[in-house]
UniProtKB/Swiss-Prot annotation:
Places the protein is found: Virion; Host cell membrane
The name this protein goes by in its record: Structural protein ORF5a
Domain of life, source organism: Viruses
Subunit and partners: Interacts with proteins GP2B and GP4.
Keyword Ion transport appears in the UniProt entry: no
TM helices/strands, residue ranges: 2-22
Keyword entries, A-Z: Host cell membrane, Host membrane, Membrane, Transmembrane, Transmembrane helix, Virion
Taxonomy of the source species: Viruses, Riboviria, Orthornavirae, Pisuviricota, Pisoniviricetes
Assigned GO CC terms: host cell plasma membrane; membrane; virion component
Keyword rRNA processing appears in the UniProt entry: no
């Protein structure tokens, strides 16, 4: 039972880190695109 909880926590942490990384990447890409085009982008 404890091993299942540990595996679930590991996968949840991995998902959280992956989501945060993708979120940061999207923010950087939007900022770079806005700087390139010089047009305000509404999300």
């Amino acid at each position: 039972m404890f091993s299942q909880i540990g595996a679930f926590l590991d996968s949840a942490l991995l998902l959280l880190v992956a989501f945060f990384a993708v979120y940061r990447l999207v923010l950087v890409l939007c900022r770079w695109q806005r700087r390139q085009l010089d047009i305000p982008i509404h999300i």
